[in-house]
């Protein structure tokens, strides 16, 4: 049984089909690093993260944000099995990278804010509610290995 109704899946897939993954991915990861600066410790090899402007214009941040959102897109294709879809990434982030799983929730919330900014009135309360469920589900799936 899915955690999203058929209507919610339609809302998520409808909006996601319009998302520019390159742009939104870089912006979401950049905003995470600006708003939650302690997350920068996982990206020390990315070069200059000394200011909001440096972070938001950093090519490595943008490239990794794109990679993150491409994985998110793949997860949306397997929305009814997020734990399976993100099992390998959960293992990587837990066992090798030692990322605090709370960061997955933070990134999900930042992504929702970025989507709201990009889509304005189209990102109505129903769409937001559906995306909040999705990012919570993805965060839970990514944290699964930690349990």
UniProtKB/Swiss-Prot annotation:
Annotated GO MF terms: haptoglobin binding; heme binding; hemoglobin alpha binding; metal ion binding; organic acid binding; oxygen binding; oxygen carrier activity; peroxidase activity
SUPFAM superfamilies xrefs: Globin-like (SSF46458)
GO CC annotations on file: blood microparticle; haptoglobin-hemoglobin complex; hemoglobin complex
Source organism superkingdom: Eukaryota
List of residues that carry Phosphoserine: 45, 51
Annotated positions of the Asymmetric dimethylarginine modification: 105
This protein's UniProt keywords: Acetylation, Heme, Iron, Metal-binding, Methylation, Oxygen transport, Phosphoprotein, Transport
Tissue: Red blood cells.
List of residues that carry N-acetylserine: 2
Domain (Globin): residue spans on this chain: 3-147
Classification via Pfam families: Globin
GO biological process: hydrogen peroxide catabolic process
Residues with PTM N6-succinyllysine: 18, 60
Record-listed heme b binding positions: 64, 93
Keyword Heme on entry: yes
PANTHER family, per the entry: HEMOGLOBIN FAMILY MEMBER (PTHR11442), HEMOGLOBIN SUBUNIT BETA (PTHR11442:SF42)
Family of the protein in this entry: Belongs to the globin family.
Oligomeric form and interacting partners: Heterotetramer of two alpha chains and two beta chains.
Protein function: Involved in oxygen transport from the lung to the various peripheral tissues.
Other comments on record: In the cat family (felidae), the oxygen affinity of hemoglobin depends little or not at all on the association with diphosphoglycerate (DPG).
Record-given protein name: Hemoglobin subunit beta-1
Gene name of the record: HBB1
């Amino acid at each position: 049984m899915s955690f999203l109704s058929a209507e919610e899946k339609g809302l998520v897939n409808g909006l996601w089909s319009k998302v520019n993954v390159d742009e939104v991915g870089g912006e979401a990861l950049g905003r995470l690093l600006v708003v939650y600066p302690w997350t920068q410790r996982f990206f020390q090899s990315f070069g200059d993260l000394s200011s909001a402007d440096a972070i938001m214009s950093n090519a490595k941040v943008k490239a990794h944000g794109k990679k993150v959102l491409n994985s998110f897109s793949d997860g949306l294709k397997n929305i009814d099995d997020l734990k399976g879809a993100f099992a390998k990434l959960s293992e990587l982030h837990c066992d090798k990278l030692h990322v605090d799983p709370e960061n997955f929730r933070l990134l999900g919330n930042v992504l929702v804010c970025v989507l709201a900014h990009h889509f304005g009135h189209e990102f109505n309360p129903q769409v937001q509610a559906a995306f909040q469920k999705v990012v919570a589900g993805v965060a839970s799936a990514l944290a699964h290995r930690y349990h």
